[in-house]
């Protein structure tokens, strides 16, 4: 069976655009060539590709999309290229456009923050329309970073009066009372990922100014007890390490004009043996509650180095095999 062959050309404005869509040292071009059998050659300001007609059509669509994104000021990564290839192959170009069209915020250094997967886009849209959003998924899915970006955007747009970020201050069995230094010294290491995200969005000087005014508060979860948080964007990070009692306490801090986001990874629970995770319980108890949105991220939503996705996949397969083995052992014991 023979397929119709064709050749097409994409022309760019200059070498800067060529590097922008093919990557430094053709890093992005190599990713593209891995996915297609067609011959792809870049020379001067022209990219020529030839092969089976349907595949050539997909390649043309891909390059046009990459060129469009680059011209919108978006630095392209290998993840962007791989994800775009997959979406185009599935005929979901419109969804890809919609996802990349929305810039959440521009960081202090001028970088555009956007959703990078449909799962992330769904998460962002859920946060926008929900009073409380629970985001569950592995590292690298942007759960916390995107929530912080939306919080900063809401603050800048005067939709809220302050941002409150918190996480459990006891992880991996460490008790704050046994750590050296004053309370700030003790809690800073636990809150550092939240500081990092805020520094990225605002810059150190603006962040410190907001903290001094009380516009931004970063504190351990225990500091939330007995408060009602009105007109606030509230984020609870590492929520898998809350107990059910702590989670209920946190949820009931919600006040008028506020928005709440809870993030965590239920495969990384550091609670002592016998302690249930408040995040797992909340996701179950609140799944049908009006105003509450629940998003579960998967491997496809990991936007880090490819090795991170591979590691997550390996652990998920391992956990699945262990679960099946436990079920088989239980069945065998029941039959004795």
Language model region names:
Residues 1-3, 89-103, 320-336:
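Intrinsically disordered, low-complexity linkers and terminal tails enriched in Pro/Gly
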Residues 2-20:
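Short glycine-/aliphatic-rich beta-strand segments at the starts of folded cytosolic domains
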Residues 9-11, 48-50, 296-298:
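Generic structural detector for well-ordered beta-strands
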Residues 17-34:
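Short amphipathic alpha-helix segments
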Residues 21, 28, 59-62, 247-250:
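Hydrophobic side chains in well-ordered alpha-helices
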Residues 30, 36-39, 45:
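Compact, well-ordered interaction domains used in eukaryotic information-processing assemblies
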Residues 41-100:
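Interdomain "pre-motor" coupling segment immediately N-terminal to P-loop NTPase/helicase cores
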Residues 46, 106-121, 126-236, 240-336:
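Conserved helicase motor core of SF1/SF2 NTP-dependent helicases
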């Amino acid at each position: 069976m023979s397929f119709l062959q064709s050749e097409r050309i994409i022309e760019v404005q200059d070498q800067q655009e060529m590097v922008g869509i093919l990557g430094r040292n053709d890093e992005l071009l190599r990713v593209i060539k891995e996915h297609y059998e067609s011959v792809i050659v870049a020379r001067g300001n022209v990219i020529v590709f030839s092969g089976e007609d349907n595949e050539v059509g997909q390649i043309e669509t891909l390059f046009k999309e990459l060129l469009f994104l680059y011209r919108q000021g978006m630095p392209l990564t290998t993840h962007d290229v791989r994800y775009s290839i997959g979406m185009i192959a599935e005929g979901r170009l419109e969804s890809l456009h919609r996802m990349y069209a929305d810039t959440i915020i521009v960081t202090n250094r001028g970088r555009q923050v956007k959703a990078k997967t449909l799962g992330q886009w769904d998460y962002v849209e859920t946060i926008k329309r929900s009073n409380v959003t629970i985001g569950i998924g592995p590292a690298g899915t942007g759960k916390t970073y995107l929530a912080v970006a939306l919080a900063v955007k809401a603050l800048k747009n005067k939709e809220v009066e302050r941002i409150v970020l918190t996480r459990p201050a006891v992880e991996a069995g460490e008790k704050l009372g046994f750590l050296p230094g004053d309370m700030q010294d003790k809690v800073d290491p636990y809150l550092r990922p939240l500081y990092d995200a805020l520094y990225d969005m605002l810059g150190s000087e603006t962040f410190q100014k907001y903290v001094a005014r009380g516009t931004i508060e970063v504190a351990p979860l225990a500091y939330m007890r007995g408060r009602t948080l009105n007109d606030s964007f509230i984020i609870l990070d590492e929520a898998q390490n809350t107990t059910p009692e702590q989670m209920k306490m946190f949820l009931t801090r919600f006040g008028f004009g506020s928005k709440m986001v809870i993030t965590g990874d239920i495969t990384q629970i550091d609670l002592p043996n016998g302690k249930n995770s408040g995040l797992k319980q909340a996701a179950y108890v609140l799944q049908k509650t009006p105003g509450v949105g629940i998003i579960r991220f998967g491997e496809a939503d990991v936007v880090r180095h490819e090795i991170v996705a591979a590691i997550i996949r390996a652990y998920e397969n391992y956990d699945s095999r262990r679960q099946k083995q436990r079920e088989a052992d239980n069945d065998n014991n029941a039959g004795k």
